[in-house]
Amino acid sequence: MTYRYVIAAMVLAFSLVPDVSLAQVNVTGTWQPKNWTLRISLRQEGTRVWGFGGQQDFWFRGQWDGDRLVLVANNFQEKRKNTCKARGVFTLSGKTVSLLDGVWFQSDTGRTLKGPWVRLSPDAGAAVQYPYATELMYCGTLQTYELAFASGSDVLQGTDWPILAAVADLLKKDGALTIDVAGHTDSTGDAKANQALSERRAAAVKQALVTKYGADPARITSKGWGAEQPIQDNGTVDGRAMNRRVEIVRAR
């Protein structure tokens, strides 16, 4: 079955459940969004979350950012080796593991849909690896919400980053491939400080690709954009969570 969506950006903001701590949250399982016909399998390890919908046509990946789960959604149809049919960014703000009640917005059409995601089962099925290389080659950009920085810091949290391992492996396999690493912040605080921070974060991602995963530094550029290129409204908490990102862009 083929799922066809035309989505430029999505926001999914969920209500908080105050008696459940963030440390207890794990969204691993099979989910049914009210407004979709396909079921979604999500898997969580630490703060990283990834999964798919349907027959692995629609993919999700991201990470908890405070009390919000920022996810990228792609419908690049890996099995059919097709180009991207949908891209989106979700912000989930929820501390329940059975019902996520919220709203998602299609910015290309202006349509807003409300309704819950219900977890049908804590079983996500067989483990699958997220196809980062396919997304980069067919979509052109990886918004790396899996890479976490403390507020105001340019130090990558954690010690292993599957998304960077996949990008480095792709660079080794494709000798003609070059990439740009672009850092972005939200608009909170001083513009000059945000610009400098975005540059340092982009440089940190490049450094991790080179020193940990053996990528060729000559084929990677890094640049910071500060708050100049938001993808959502900086006037909202959800929008700011999506705007804080590092992107890996296929340069050729």
What would you call each of these model-derived segments?
Residues 1-8:
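Bacterial N-terminal signal peptides that target proteins for export
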Residues 24-96, 101-104:
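Central antiparallel beta-sheet cores of small beta-barrel/beta-sandwich binding domains
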Residues 182-252:
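Periplasmic OmpA-like peptidoglycan-binding domain that tethers envelope proteins to the cell wall
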Residues 17-23:
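Sec/Tat signal peptide C-region and signal peptidase I cleavage site
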Residues 46, 55, 64, 73-77, ...:
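A mature extracytoplasmic/lumenal domain signature
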Residues 92-178, 211, 252:
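Periplasmic peptidoglycan-binding/tethering modules of Gram-negative envelope proteins
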Residues 28, 161, 165-168, 194, ...:
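Extracytoplasmic/secreted envelope proteins and their assembly/folding machinery
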Residues 8-17:
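Bacterial N-terminal signal peptides
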